Amino acid sequence: MSLHRVPRGWPASRRAAAAAIEAGLTNAGFPNKLHRSMSRPVIEYEDVVRPEWIDSNGHMNLAYYVVVFDFATDALYRALDIGDAYREASGNSCFTAETHTLYEREVHLGDRLQVRTWLLGADTKRLHYFHEMFHAESGERSAVQELMALHIDMGIRRVAPYPPEQYAALQQAVKAYAPATLPNGAGRRIALPNR
């Protein structure tokens, strides 16, 4: 099992939790499910706010929203067959080139989270997708993250085209899982209002 996204300095308990998530285990003390269906969105990833994610303000620290979105990205890559197994078999991977995270509502210790992921587009070298994090019980949206990933040839560690069969599969996935309209928050930029 690869823990390539887990920082070396993380304590053993946090590394174990990440390993359980990556392995898709459901007996790790919190739910972790990957649903694949032909209905939109492409995946739904679930998690629970853990004690080590709570900051001095009594809510989940902003960094852990990104961690949950990263776990959802791993689930997305597995669902699209561009995850760890793809990297090992092809020598290719995906690197995140750009993200934009918008925090909308607090979440607290023990809150169940659901992340829905939408495919916004793909070309020969890029994948554009959008995560929405919801409070599972209330249904309120808590945060969103928009991402652009680049396809990388790991042998030279440079951007490279997807192999033709993978590119075709991604195009089919985008057709199947693209939202009818852009989700609220997609395409935003950070700027001060004009005066």
What are the roles of these predicted feature ranges?
Residues 13, 21-114, 120-195:
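Terminal targeting signals and extreme-terminal segments of soluble enzymes
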Residues 6, 17-22:
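Compositionally biased low-complexity segments, especially N-terminal hydrophobic helices
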